[in-house]
């Protein structure tokens, strides 16, 4: 918009912001909403940028819109099969109706306890979901193959406070432990060193393991360069998490870089 282009933003959601709008509802992350709010304020001052919320566009609508440049910012989705840093194959039993992903917690769909949060991502998400569930009154067990909760946050000097917070809330922590199998009302756990197994009763399981980019729409479009040329589309690009699951800061940088480099060769 600042470079003078006519820009149309079609957002499938009813509010702008993508994952920022979701994650800023988690305990302690309200300030993250400013990442969205500042940009919304800037866009509202630009006559050449139009925003359409609750506006899903299929391939046909994109093709017929008349834009010369198409940018997909469709994000990434948390896996529901348990594949992550430790498990390279689907965890047995991961397809059950009592097995959830992070979005289900943020949208209030996890109702039955005890809840096991399995964190094989090791960043901030698993611990925050456990904190939210605990403050909502659920009995929570935090299971992780790591030696500590949210191992990545050792680099940001937050790890001690995060683990202390969970313990203060009564969250049970099972470290250096993997999930071998998900049953209907219990888990079969395994020590990551010896493989020794144990059982853990549960009502729901939340898998926080890894994310996959929502890139399918881009690839469908990119397969038809002849059609794109016919309708006047010059370029199609991916930015943010749908290019590669990353931090919010990196996704913002990705979008800014695209905007700076558009038509740079002309």
Per-region residue spans from a language model:
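Short, electropositive, low-hydrophobicity segments enriched in small/polar residues
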Residues: 21-22, 79, 244, 259
């Amino acid at each position: 918009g600042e470079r003078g282009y006519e820009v149309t933003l079609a957002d499938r959601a009813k509010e702008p912001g993508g994952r920022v709008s979701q994650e800023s509802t988690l305990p302690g992350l309200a300030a993250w909403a400013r990442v969205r709010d500042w940009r919304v304020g800037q866009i509202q001052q630009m006559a050449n940028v139009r925003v359409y919320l609750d506006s899903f566009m299929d391939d046909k609508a994109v093709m017929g819109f008349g834009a010369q440049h198409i940018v997909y910012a469709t994000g990434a989705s948390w896996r529901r099969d348990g594949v992550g840093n430790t498990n390279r194959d689907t965890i047995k039993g991961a397809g059950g109706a009592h097995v959830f992903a992070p979005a289900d917690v943020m949208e209030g769909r996890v109702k039955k306890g005890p809840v096991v949060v399995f964190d094989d991502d090791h960043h901030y998400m698993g611990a925050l979901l456990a904190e939210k569930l605990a403050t909502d009154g659920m009995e929570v067990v935090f299971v992780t193959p790591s030696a500590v909760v949210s191992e990545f946050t050792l680099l940001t000097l937050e790890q001690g406070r995060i683990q202390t917070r969970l313990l203060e809330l009564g969250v049970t922590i099972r470290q250096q432990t993997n999930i071998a199998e998900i049953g209907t009302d219990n888990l079969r756990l395994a020590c990551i060193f010896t493989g020794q197994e144990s059982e853990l009763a549960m009502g729901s399981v939340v898998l926080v393991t890894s994310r996959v980019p929502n890139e399918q729409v881009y690839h469908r479009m990119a397969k038809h360069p002849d059609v794109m040329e016919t309708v006047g589309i010059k370029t199609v690009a991916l930015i943010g998490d749908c290019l590669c699951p990353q931090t919010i800061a990196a996704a913002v940088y990705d979008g800014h870089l695209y905007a700076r480099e558009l038509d740079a060769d002309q």
